[in-house]
């Protein structure tokens, strides 16, 4: 099975953007656990918002937008956000300068990582993306942080 021309084109554009972004500046792969806090109306946003101020290029699998929106939907169901808040959060997320990579292009290496680590495929998509671009991973998920350390993916820290 081959990658669709559309998927190939998006991936090529991301690679071109990454290549021209700057020597020595590692891109940062952002997962849903980080993006969630940016627009969730949380009182404890912590240092996660500092990620938006970085000079590094932000990269994410397209899966991240759906995962993040699902987390906001859970807050909606609990009465912690209203539908307008969720819609605004989605709009703000999609307006960010994030290079979106088709998740389908990461499934083979992610499946290998999932098998090797005994870790969910969803998280391994982020790991596969970080490994394929020598990127740093930004996540608030402790299990994913441990998996990243096991495969040699560097972790982002607000402390620099």
Name each model feature, range by range.
Residues 145-150:
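Short loop/helix-cap segments at secondary-structure boundaries that form the rim of catalytic
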Residues 1-63, 75-88, 151:
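Short, well-structured N-terminal submotif of metal-dependent ribonuclease cores
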